[in-house]
Structures are given as structure tokens and as C-alpha cells.
Design a protein with these regions (language model features):
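N-terminal secretion-targeting helices of virulence/extracellular proteins
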Residues: 1-87
Length: 87
């Protein structure tokens, strides 16, 4: 038989971790984007890299950030359900 339950406080801490790290990834993306825009770098390699950044790397970071937000929201939903079940 499956066990159901969880430590409410720990779930809250887990959600906070997902939220915090989501903001970290968002800030990391912003910092790299800004520095890439202001870095003196020209030529075909620079163009290829900037294209890869905007087409692949930044997209991957945005997806990671969104996944962390969604994971935090899911933990919050489960935490709420456990609180309601215990009431």
C-alpha cells in the first residue's frame, strides 16, 4: 500500500528553494544576456555564438526557470492538499 503524507514545513522549504533557484536562473540569464550584448566581439564566430545564445542557450535557461516555477507550484499544491486532508 502506498504511503501518503509529508512534513508540511519541509514542503514549504522545498517550495521556497524552487522559487529562489528560479530567480537565480532568471538573474543568471539576464546577466549573461547583458554582458553578451556589451562585449566587443565581431565576426562570424561571434554571430554564430550570439545566434546559438538566443536560439538555444537562453531558451534552455528560460525553460529551466519555468520548470522550477512549475515544480514550486506543484509542491505548494501538494502541501495545501495535505493541510486540507489533515483538517
Amino acid at each position: 500500500m502506498a504511503r501518503i503524507g509529508g512534513e508540511i514545513e519541509q514542503l514549504g522549504q522545498l517550495k521556497a528553494t524552487f522559487d529562489r533557484e528560479s530567480r537565480t536562473v532568471e538573474e543568471l540569464t539576464r546577466v549573461i544576456r547583458s554582458q553578451l550584448q556589451t562585449t566587443a566581439w565581431e565576426g562570424p564566430a561571434a554571430e554564430r555564438f550570439r545566434s546559438m545564445w538566443s536560439g538555444e542557450f537562453e531558451v534552455s535557461l528560460r525553460r529551466l526557470q519555468e520548470a522550477l516555477v512549475e515544480a514550486g507550484a506543484e509542491v505548494a499544491r501538494r502541501q495545501t492538499a495535505l493541510v486540507q486532508a489533515g483538517s
